[in-house]
Amino acid sequence: MTDFQYATDQDTIAAQATAPGRGGVGIIRLSGPKSLAIAKQIIGFEPKPRYAHYVPFKTTGQEQLDEGIALYFPGPNSFTGEDVFELQGHGGPVIMDMLLSHCVALGARLARPGEFSERAFMNDKMDLTQAEAIADLIDSTSEQAAKCALRSLQGAFSKRVDELVEALIHLRIYVEAAIDFPEEEIDFIGDGKVAAELAGIQAKLAEVLKEANQGALIREGMNVVIAGRPNAGKSSLLNALSGKESAIVTNIEGTTRDVLREHIHLDGMPLHIIDTAGLRDSPDEVERIGIQRAWDEISKADRILMMVDSQSIDSKDPNEIWPEFMEKLGDTKHLTLVRNKVDLTKEGTGIETVSGVPVVSLSAKTGEGVTDLTEHLKAVMGFDSTTEGGFIARRRHIEALNKANRFLDAGNEQLHGYGAGELLAEDLKEAQQALSEITGAFTSDDLLGRIFGSFCIGK
C-alpha cells in the first residue's frame, strides 16, 4: 500500500470548507473514521444521520466556542464515501480557527489541498474528471465555463471517454481471441470487421477531441499579444478589445514601456490580451527591458497581432512590411497582421490572406473592423460559441486523447500495412490505457498528487 493510499484510508481530516475571511456562515468539515466520535464530543450527543441539529459547539471542558448547525453523513453515503461531519457556524476567522484547532485536538489532522475530493475519488464516489470539475466549477470565470464544469461534474466527459474505452475493450477481445485461438480460423485482417470498428472508434475519438478542445478553450482561453512599432495603435486596440481605457494612449512614442494585461470574454471564451512596448532600437534602458519582455510574451502567445499603421504602409505582405520582425519571429502560424487606422486611409475593413498570413484591416479608434478581429480570433482557435452541451477539459485531457489517437494510428498501420495482429493488439491496449488516464482508471499516484494538490484546502 502506498503512502498516498495509507493517508486516505486511516486518518480523519479536517479543514475549513468555506473561503477564508469574514462571512455570515463558516463551515468546518471532517471526514474519516473518527468523525462521529469527534462530533459527539463537540455537540454532546450522537447526531442523527442527514439531520440538521442547531446546537452549541463546546470543548471537552464545556466551554462554548460557537453555536450553529451540525450535520452528520455516515459513509458510504457521503461526499467522500467516509463518515463526514460538518459544523456550520459564524464565519469569522477567529471562530473558524478555534473550531478547527479543537477538531485537531480531538484527533483529526489538517487536510491537504483537495484531500476531500481525493478521498471521494479513491472511494469511487467520482472519477478523476469529475473531481477536477469541482475545482473548475469553483474557479470558473464565465457563465459558460460554469455550465461546462457542471456538466463534467455530472459525468458528461466521463461518459464519452468510457464509451471509447468500452469500444476498445470489445475490439481487443476480438483481436486477441483470434491471436490466442488460431484453430478458430478467424481472419480478422481480411474480414473487414476490425478495420471498420477501428475506423468507428477513431471517428468518435475525433469528435470527443474536438469537444475537449472547446472545453479547454472555455477553461483556459487564449493569450493574444499585440506587438508592433511605437505609435502603431497597440494600446488603442487593447482599449477597443477590453471596452475600457486600460492603457494610456498618446502620440508620444514609447508611452507603453511595460507589459499590460486585460482579461475579457468572447462568447464565453476567456481572452487574455497583452499589450507590449513598441519594438525598436532604443537608447533608454527601461524601454529596452520592456522590449525584451515584449519578445518574451511573443514567444509564449497563442496569437500574435502584428500592428501596423496603414497610413504609412501600403503593403499587406508582412515580409515586405517588417522583414526583421518576421525573421526573428520565424514561425508565422500564430501570426495575424493588423492594419490599423483605416478610418484615416478610407481603405475599408475586412479580412484577407497575404503570403499565408491573415490580414485584418480595422480602426482601433472608431471600432470599425474590431468585430472582424474578434471573430477571427475565435475562428483560428477553433472556438464555436454555438456549441451546446459541452464539457470542461484540461491540457492533460487533450494530451491523453492525442496520445490515444497516435496509438490508434499506429494500430491502423499495423493492420493495413503489415497485417501484424500482435502489434495491433498492443497498440489497442496502449490507446485504452491513455484514455483511462483521463478518468483515473489507470493513473499514477504522482499525477493524482499533482491534480489534487491544486485544489482548495476544504474541497
Curated annotation (Swiss-Prot):
One GO MF annotation is: GTP binding
What HAMAP family does the annotation carry?
Answer: GTPase_MnmE
Q: Which CDD domains match?
A: trmE, TrmE_N
What cofactor is this protein dependent on? K(+)
Oligomer status and interactors: Homodimer. Heterotetramer of two MnmE and two MnmG subunits.
Q: Please tell me where (6S)-5-formyl-5,6,7,8-tetrahydrofolate binds in this chain.
A: 29, 86, 125, 459
InterPro entries, per this entry?
G_TrmE (IPR031168), GTP-bd (IPR006073), GTP-bd_TrmE_N (IPR018948), GTPase_MnmE (IPR004520), MnmE_dom2 (IPR027368), MnmE_helical (IPR025867), P-loop_NTPase (IPR027417), Small_GTP-bd (IPR005225)
Q: Please list the residues that bind K(+).
A: 231, 250, 252, 255
Q: Which family does it belong to?
A: Belongs to the TRAFAC class TrmE-Era-EngA-EngB-Septin-like GTPase superfamily. TrmE GTPase family.
Q: NCBIfam families given for it?
A: mnmE_trmE_thdF (TIGR00450), PRK05291.1-3 (NF003661), small_GTP (TIGR00231)
What species is given as this protein's source?
Marinomonas sp. (strain MWYL1)
Q: Can you name a GO cellular component term? A: cytosol
Alphabetical UniProt keywords: Cytoplasm, GTP-binding, Hydrolase, Magnesium, Metal-binding, Nucleotide-binding, Potassium, tRNA processing
- Classification lineage: Bacteria, Pseudomonadati, Pseudomonadota, Gammaproteobacteria, Oceanospirillales
Q: What is its main location?
A: cytoplasm
Q: Does the keyword Hydrolase apply?
A: yes
- Explain the purpose of this protein: Exhibits a very high intrinsic GTPase hydrolysis rate. Involved in the addition of a carboxymethylaminomethyl (cmnm) group at the wobble position (U34) of certain tRNAs, forming tRNA-cmnm(5)s(2)U34.
Gene3D superfamilies (UniProt xref): P-loop containing nucleotide triphosphate hydrolases (3.40.50.300), Probable tRNA modification gtpase trme, domain 1 (3.30.1360.120), tRNA modification GTPase MnmE domain 2 (1.20.120.430)
Keyword Magnesium among record annotations:
yes
Q: Do you know which PROSITE patterns this protein is assigned to?
A: G_TRME (PS51709)
Protein name (Swiss-Prot/TrEMBL) = tRNA modification GTPase MnmE
| A Pfam family hit | MMR_HSR1
